[in-house]
Amino acid sequence: KRQALDGEASDDSVEPAVMNENRRPPDQINIVIDPGHGGADPGKIGASGSCEREVNLAISMITGEMLTERGYNVFFTRRDDNGLYDDSDVNKKAADMRKRCSIIEEAQADVVISIHQNSFTDSDVCGAQMFYYTHSAEGKKLAEIMQESFRKFVNTDNTRGCKANDLYYMLIHTPCPTVIAECGFLSNPEEEKQLNDNVYRNKIALAITEAVEKYFGNDSSN
C-alpha cells in the first residue's frame, strides 16, 4: 500500500472496474431472432433427411421464449414454416431477405441472431460456429461471446472460433450487431440427431441467451 495525499491508505493493486458500454436492463433491449430459410427454401438437408428450416424454427422459438422469460423484447422474422415472399415474386430468395431486413429495422433491433445449420461434404465435420460482419466491432464482440457460450453450454470439445464474413446478405444489410449462429452440421449423423433433440435444443437456446446476457452486462459476472 502507499499513502495517498490526504493521508488515507490506497492500494495500487486494485484495478478499476471495466464498464460495459452496452449495459442496459432487458426491458430496454430489442432482440430479433431470425430463423433461417423457410417456405420453398428448405436450407440444408441432413444426413437422415432433416430439413434445416424446421430445425432453425424450433431452436428459434425456444430461444425466443427463454429470452422473453429473462425480460427482453423479442421479435421474430418468421414464426411458422412459410417464407417471407409473395407467390408473385420472381426472385423469392431476394424478396425473402429484403423482408427480413425490413422486419429488423421496424423492430429497431439492438441485436439480431440468425439461426442456421451447417453442412459439409465430409460427414465427420461438426461443431457450432458464429459468423459476424467483417466491419462490425460490436458484431465481432457478440460473436466471440456467443462462440464461447456454445463451448460452455453445448459442447466443451468444440475448438471452432467465430469467423468474419463480408458476403452474407443478412450481415451486410442489418444496421445493428448481427450474428449468424450455425448451430451444428446436419451432414454429421450424430450432430443431426442432437439438433433434433429438444434437450440439446434447449442447451443451444441457453448458450444464446447467456451470450446476450453477457453482451448487455446482465449476467451474474456484472
Language model segments and positions:
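Gram-positive cell-envelope targeting signals
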Residues: 1-4
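Catalytic-core regions of hydrolytic enzymes
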Residues: 7-144, 152
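Generic alpha-helical propensity signal that fires on short helical segments
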Residues: 51, 90-92, 131, 146-150, ...
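Active-site-adjacent mobile loop/cap segments within catalytic or ligand-binding domains
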Residues: 107, 114, 121, 158-222
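Proline/glycine-rich low-complexity loops and linkers
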Residues: 144-160
